[in-house]
Amino acid sequence: MYNEIVKRAELGPFDVSETSSLENVIDFGAIKLPNLNRNLSIKVELEEDTRRLVALTLQTETSMLQVSLFSAPKNSTVWQEVLEVLTSSLESQNAQVNSVIGSFGRELLVAMQVPNEDGSTALQQIRFIGVDGPRWLLRGSITGEALTNLTEQSEIERVFRSIVVDRGTEALPPRELVPLTMPPGNIAPPARPQ
């Protein structure tokens, strides 16, 4: 586990305590996104019941990365536990779930049927990644060409690794979504693939 912590601290995603500068970032409070790519659009995701901001969807022309931040205990990690819960949930929806070792350690590759607007279904593939940090877990779900195109995969992974987390000091139960805040200005919704 120590090697994973050192690797994360060197390669990202980063804890705010590990970075010396927060210039040129889009500040969502607990998640700070360096302004890396003009072709990257950002959409905020709100919790349906509470309307609080809980996730960000980052989209290139051909791929999407959705990121969520979860609280974790001070002296332990939660990604393994989250993987088990996520696997059970997805399998209960008849998804095919494969646990693999990838760029971020243990990951899930998922194939599942999702409904289309016309009532038919389509096979969607999703890659779930997660990185434990000090008192936090950053989870990402990747769809689109980044699942098969190495250049696109590298770009999406670079975006995920560039995120800076400012978890704050508020006590939260383990695996609780850490709420985000809107930055000043407008955030354009991602363009729909054609």
PLM regions: where:
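Coil-to-beta-strand transition motifs
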Residues: 62-65, 133-139
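Generic detector of bulky aromatic hydrophobic side chains
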Residues: 79-80, 135-142, 177
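Conserved beta-strand segments of the P-loop GTPase G domain that flank and frequently precede/overlap
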Residues: 68-70, 111, 140-143
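N-terminal targeting sequences that direct proteins away from the cytosol to non-cytosolic compartments
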Residues: 1-55, 59, 63, 71, ...
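Signature of long, low-cysteine stretches enriched in small and polar/charged residues
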Residues: 85-132, 185
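Short, solvent-exposed recognition patches
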Residues: 69, 73-95
